[in-house]
Amino acid sequence: MEKERPQWDNPLQFVFACISYAVGLGNVWRFPYLCQLYGGGSFLIPYLIMLVVEGMPLLYLELAVGQRMQQGSIGSWRTISPYLSGVGVASVVVSFFLSMYYNVVNAWGFWYLFHSFQNPLPWSVCPLNSNRTGYDEECEAASSTQYFWYRKTLNISPSIQESGAVQWELALCLILAWLMVYLCILRGTESTGKVVYFTALLPYCVLIIYLGRGLTLRGATNGLIYMFTPKGSSALSLRFQVEQLANPKTWINAATQIFFSLGLGFGSLIAFASYNKPSNDCQKHAIIVSLINSATSIFASIVTFSIYGFKATFNYESCLDKVILLLTNSFDLEDGSLTASNLEEMKDYLASTYPSKYSEVFPSIKNCSLESELDTAVQGTGLAFIVYSEAIKNMEVSQLWSVLYFFMLLMLGIGSMLGNTAAILTPLTDSKVISSHLPKEVISGLVCLINCAVGMVFTMEAGNYWFDIFNDYAATLSLLLIVLVETIALCYVYGLRRFESDLKAMTGRALSWYWKVLWAGVSPLLIVSLFAFYLSDYILTGTLQYQAWDASQGQLVTKDYPTYALAVIGLLVASSTMCIPLGALGIFIMRHLKRADTAPVA
Amino acid sequence: MLWLLFLLVTASHAQLCQPGAENAFKVRLSIKAALGKKAYAWDINEEYLFRAMVAFSMRKIPKREATEIAHVLLCNVTQRVSFWFVVTDPSKNHTIPAAEVQSAIRMSRNRINNAFSLNDQTLEFLRIPSTLAPPVDESVPAWIIIFGVIFCIVIVAISLLVLSGIWQSRRKKTETSEVIDSEDKCEHMITMENGNPLDEKGGHVNDAFMSEDERLTPL
């Protein structure tokens, strides 16, 4: 008596699972950065084109494969052709790498969340130095938010060679993050199906609240105007935007953002779709999920830019206040006579009246510019943990906003983790060998335990540098290759006509020519060009470098990777990409040996 | 004669209190920045209060001769508001060493601030660093408490789910074993009714059935 495959209680759970997986931290911390870098509002044009041409078709393809084969990634590709089981294994390996380092972000989220229940927020003030006459030097050189991130949270070492010890506080947060993930995946779709209601919907609630708060902040409009018309005046910005549209890098970055934002190639989408009823309309769901994912990116960047605007305006006004104080003290002017509005004319007056004294003071007078404050484009953990926390500390009732924000980050992160772990667990639970010996709960527990143990590497003092290595190299090239092989395999090995008739029998829906053209032609070509671009970029850059934190200067410096780090990078990329040819080779050898065995008998 | 003496005294005073003089300190007030609309104007009465506060701080140091208000000299008052002051000894010929004045002011800094409704940032004594308030030292940091609470909740939830899963699978096992038993009995019955000669598990022979057969076959 075979056990029935678990299924989602209703299609809505499936859609929410896909949304909570696809809508992750990348929508919040990568898209606004790309938007700012490649022309603001005009970046939306290549982004939306790539969504329609690349995102939707590939998402539909993965969901259709999972729903048709009713198995995880390894089983699905093995059914299509036994030589392709390597593709499934490669997906599982990449998902394994991803879940190892991704949960560390959740650990950081927990850390900041727990520290938000203090007054004042710990990253808003610098700690005192040893004799209590001033502030800590590192904090003075950098800023209090950077100090809290680099020193108190990460306790970062000056270079990747100095590993340092495991930070017990961060290790505890990592253990908690993994326990939380285990709690959500413990019972398979039964528990995941309920959790995704929260992980999919709650971030939107927080984003809406933040939109309301962000738009009413002082100086938010500066940020929004900057987002749509970067580089100042409208004539200049229009030229800049048109230039960016002609730049191939803009299109490549739009394509890669769509590709990685949807989480294609990890096997998570195949895993989720395999728990669907075969009659489920996955075309509709694919379109809905990809549209919601992109809309969330745009929505999140509106919120981010209004926060940028607030932070830039606040810093600009503090800079002006410092200049005013400096001039007032140097020339003993009446307190309050210098304001932001009369600063320029007063400077000229002082320069003409007391030229010698003015020239003494002049080097210390900073040129405060709103433009330069807005121009600091930040992405990744820097945006999420430094820039945002800096903006939050200046808001009223900052504890509330801080709690809301880090809670949202946690929801986004855990939602993505559910998909990552599903990609690893579904093939394991599908396999008869493993699931007959161990119950589902034990398999999930073992996977979480192994990931947690390896993840301790990222809680060491040099952990953030290893995190950056994994973040930049573990998934990028391998995924492109995996999805390329998937598309070609489905269209040419399994046969597009055969799949089309399968889908018609399954869902009752005919496959329109649009999808056929994209699957068979356009998308593979696009992926090949992305792959070629990435390879050429790696080769041209020569030695790979990373940003290390220099405590004495209070800023990041560029350093070269040591050889063993380069070896690890090579191993990461090779271990997942090599699965594909090795899998095919392995099956070929096994079949050859079987034929050799059976031949004498016949 | 008298006014000659007076001139001499003020001249010596002027020498004692000068910007940058030995043992002189510059003070800077930002009254408008601190109090906004409630700012008071700085006049000679406020200066008198200041001199009184400095004398008070000097008197607080034990084992010293008592300082009078007249021993505190102010000069170079600007619009900012900023000025210089020195503390002289009772003979009014020498100034008290800077180190002593510094420690006296540091000890009574809070009282001086409160007298003017200002704080360390708005009433600045240049060259006298203020002791910054130490952070509130909790015995157990707040974040560990919240971490502990959430950790316990998660552990409890996991144990509940795992235990209920084990209990459910045990119940299923006993149910399926009952089902298997009753299925076995059904199979048993079927084989006996078919009259399987090989089946010697000693079931009953249905007499009524057998007798009907016997009745019919001889025909």
Where are these predicted regions, by residue range?
Chain A
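Membrane-embedded translocation segments of transport machinery
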Residues: 1-10, 193-419, 425-456, 460-461, ...
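Membrane-interface "cap" regions at the ends of multi-pass membrane proteins
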Residues: 1-29, 58-63, 73, 86, ...
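Transmembrane helix-boundary motif of multi-pass solute transporters/channels
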Residues: 13-49, 60, 180, 185-186, ...
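Hydrophobic, membrane-embedded alpha-helices of multi-pass small-molecule transporters
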Residues: 16-26, 98, 103, 140, ...
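Flexible loop linkers connecting adjacent transmembrane helices
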Residues: 30-44, 58-89, 109-127, 220-229, ...
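Hydrophobic alpha-helical segments and their helix-loop junctions in multi-pass secondary transporters
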Residues: 58, 102-107, 111-120, 137-140, ...
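Membrane-interface loop-to-helix entry segments
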Residues: 107, 111-114, 125, 172, ...
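A generic transmembrane alpha-helix motif of multi-pass inner-membrane proteins
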Residues: 456-458, 468-491, 511-602
